[in-house]
A protein has these predicted regions:
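Basic, glycine/lysine-rich polyanion-binding surfaces/domains
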Residues: 1-193
Length: 193
């Protein structure tokens, strides 16, 4: 039996505890369920905005000359022909056509991609990708434990982000940009669905 002390913690765990979050187990991670009440927090996000720690979601990088070809092999969408800084929603299917997971694929360049997957399917996808790699040349890395991820949602979040960058509020849907602040690098996208 897994105890709360055995669970993975996101980089924001300390802040969740300090701000009184009710923490629960979710796919092997200790995650905040709520801070005040579900109704109050729902209303806040619908009327203004909210920040969600989604660091438990899987994040992979694919780099090298065949990275796009490999992603075309495992995804239901055309990935290699995406534009730079474009994001595409896709499915990763099994050999019978059933869905292993739904993912978002980000194209940094012709030879560099990032994928975000659901936390519950992360290890299954890592295994699947290793099985079907074949002779394609690319480097795969699971960067989940080395990075953090947040989602900002709500009608007023662009007003807040405008104070940090003039570019971010002008991003089109399913596009991204890369920013930095001090030593931290950020990938910022408009990908809600």
């Amino acid at each position: 039996m897994t105890t709360m002390t055995d669970l993975k913690k996101t980089p924001f765990h300390k802040a969740h505890v300090e701000h009184g979050a009710k923490l629960v187990e979710y796919t092997g991670w200790e995650m905040p369920l709520l801070y005040t009440s579900i109704i109050e927090e729902h209303r806040q996000v619908r009327e203004a905005g909210g920040l969600f720690d989604v660091s438990h979601m899987g994040r992979f990088t694919f780099k090298g000359r065949d990275a796009g070809r490999f992603l075309d092999r495992v995804c239901t969408r055309d990935i290699a022909n995406m534009q730079d800084r474009q994001v595409r929603y896709a499915l990763v299917c099994n050999e019978e056509g059933g869905c292993r997971d739904d993912v978002l694929v980000y194209r940094q360049s012709e030879t560099e991609y990032t994928m975000v997957c659901n936390a519950a399917n992360r290890s299954k996808l890592v295994d699947h990708f290793a099985e079907v790699k074949g002779d394609l040349v690319y480097r795969f890395a699971d960067i989940t434990d080395k990075t953090a991820m947040v989602a900002l949602q709500g009608p007023k979040v662009m007003d807040v982000l405008a104070g940090f960058s003039k570019e971010i509020p002008t991003l089109k849907r399913y596009r991204f940009t890369e920013k930095s602040l001090f030593i931290a690098k950020f990938l910022v996208s408009r990908t809600g669905y």
